[in-house]
């Protein structure tokens, strides 16, 4: 189970299992290649994490009064990449809505308000969640 221990904000955040979603996103984003880069080189690793997302995760940690910080190299580390995914979800998708979380990963937090964003990506990820190759 892929979870991230946070402060005692909400038990559901701590116990929600994102592993199936993360596994499908990894398949879509990099096919499991930790050294994958997109065409412009900004998105890196199994989850194709941008420098902006690393910075946002560090801002979230700072707001939690945590001393932990992520580096750009952490995008190539599977465990740390998954931690960043879960941290981002815990901040911007506290209800753990899977569809919102998938769309948000692809389109950013604006996808939380505009449900039309990321539909194609959502369908692609859900295909892998449902056992597609």
What are these regions (language model features)?
Residues 51-114, 122-131:
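Alpha-helical segment that forms one wall of the substrate-binding/catalytic cleft
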Residues 14-19, 40, 95-98:
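Extracellular/periplasmic catalytic domains that process cell-envelope and extracellular macromolecules
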Residues 17, 45, 117:
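Short acidic-hydrophobic sequence patches enriched in Asp/Glu that either
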Residues 16-33, 49, 85, 100-108:
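Short, functionally critical alpha-helical segments immediately adjacent to catalytic or ligand/cofactor-binding
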Residues 6-12:
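Sec/Tat signal peptide C-region and signal peptidase I cleavage site
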Residues 1-3:
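Bacterial N-terminal signal peptides
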Residues 24-63:
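Secreted/periplasmic proteins that engage bacterial cell-wall peptidoglycan
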């Amino acid at each position: 189970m892929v979870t991230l221990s946070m402060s005692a904000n909400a038990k559901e955040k701590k116990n929600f299992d994102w592993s199936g979603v993360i596994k499908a996103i990894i398949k879509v984003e990099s096919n499991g290649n930790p050294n994958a880069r997109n065409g412009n080189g900004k998105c890196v690793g199994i989850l194709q994490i941008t420098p902006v997302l690393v910075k946002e995760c560090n801002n979230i940690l700072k707001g939690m009064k945590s001393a932990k910080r992520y580096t750009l190299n952490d995008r190539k580390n599977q465990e740390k990449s998954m931690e960043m995914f879960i941290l981002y979800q815990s901040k911007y998708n506290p209800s753990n809505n899977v569809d919102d979380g998938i769309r948000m990963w692809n389109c950013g937090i604006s996808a939380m308000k505009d449900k039309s964003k990321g539909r194609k990506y959502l369908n692609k990820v859900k295909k892998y969640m449902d056992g597609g190759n």
